[in-house]
Amino acid sequence: MGFCRTFIHKKLMIFSVRKLSYIIYIVITSFFIVKNQFIDIGDETYVNQVRSDEYTKNLAMNLTQNCANDKTCEVQAMLDFVTAIPYKINESVARSSKQVVTQNFGDCDDKSNLLISLLKAKGYEAYFVLVPEHIFVIVSLPTKLNTNALYVNDKRFYILESTAKGSKIGFPLRYKMDEIKAIIDPFSNKKLVINKLEYK
């Protein structure tokens, strides 16, 4: 019986150490996840909910499966899906991709987080653009389209408006250049350094 008690005691100690290690891992991981969701923009703080999970990757693959690697087709297919989700103001912070899809509603934060997560899953260079009381997505495409684009440091990006149902790539810029508060990479949680900004 002495051996049995000692063995059980050792097992409990191993279990406790493993459990403690797991809790520490969760706390540290959660800290970095939360830290990477917040970014300060002047006097304001923006919270993102971008995702690079299997759900988002599979959704992006399904939405673009008929595009035969046509980049314009892929981006438009993902944009069509997001804009078809009903617009409804979300009083809390932005929700995850899966929540927006399953609950079937979202505001500009929610829908932009979903859209940029889908674009990221397919390997596109895309950013958030923060303007007064709104956020939209810009994406880089290899093909020059017959529409205006936002040139960031001389690189061409097309505006994607997630809240306008049926909108197309290259949505018109409806803000003055000095109203653009920041252009953000939400996956690295960094603001782009902008030396030159043009819309043409």
Question: Whereabouts are the PLM-identified features?
Answer:
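A structural boundary/capping signal
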Residues: 1-200
